[in-house]
């Protein structure tokens, strides 16, 4: 079995980790052993927070819709129930955007909802 010198592959592996740790502070960005741990942890945080982001944004949309609905005298739950009864199929992302940027259209939807809630 011939001897294998691992200089090329080891250097490539180290380079990959060090480049992934670019922007980290202290020895985390230039010492391989520490950078490897930092990159691993960063990956764990990224994995976790890709899932958390969905929850956080949904909560933000709900808060915005609630604020918009309360301006027109409805609570969030009554507003969403009215949307279902009026068979208006807009998702929370679109509704929250309308509540912030297109108040006229949101008011029109609220009026339709009020007709179905009462």
UniProtKB/Swiss-Prot annotation:
Function: Binds directly to 23S ribosomal RNA and is necessary for the in vitro assembly process of the 50S ribosomal subunit. It is not involved in the protein synthesizing functions of that subunit.
InterPro entries: Ribosomal_bL20, RIBOSOMAL_L20_CS, Ribosomal_protein_bL20_C
This protein's GO CC annotations: ribonucleoprotein complex; ribosome
Entry keyword annotation includes RNA-binding: yes
Family per similarity comment: Belongs to the bacterial ribosomal protein bL20 family.
Gene (UniProt): rplT
Single GO biological process annotation from the record: translation
Species name: Ralstonia pickettii (strain 12J)
UniProtKB keywords: Ribonucleoprotein, Ribosomal protein, RNA-binding, rRNA-binding
One Gene Ontology MF term: structural constituent of ribosome
Listed PROSITE patterns: RIBOSOMAL_L20 (PS00937)
Keyword hit for rRNA-binding: yes
Domain of life: Bacteria
Protein name: Large ribosomal subunit protein bL20
């Amino acid at each position: 079995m011939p001897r294998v010198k691992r200089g090329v592959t080891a250097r490539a592996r180290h380079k990959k980790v060090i480049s992934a740790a670019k922007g980290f502070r202290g020895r985390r960005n230039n010492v391989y052993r520490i950078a490897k741990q930092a990159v691993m942890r960063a990956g764990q945080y990224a994995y976790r927070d890709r899932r958390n982001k969905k929850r956080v944004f949904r909560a933000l949309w709900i808060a915005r819709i609630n604020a918009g609905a309360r301006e027109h005298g409805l609570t969030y739950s009554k507003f969403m129930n009215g949307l279902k009864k009026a068979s208006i199929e807009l998702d929370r992302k679109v509704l929250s955007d309308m509540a912030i940027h297109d108040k006229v259209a949101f008011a029109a939807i609220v009026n339709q909802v009020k007709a179905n809630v009462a």
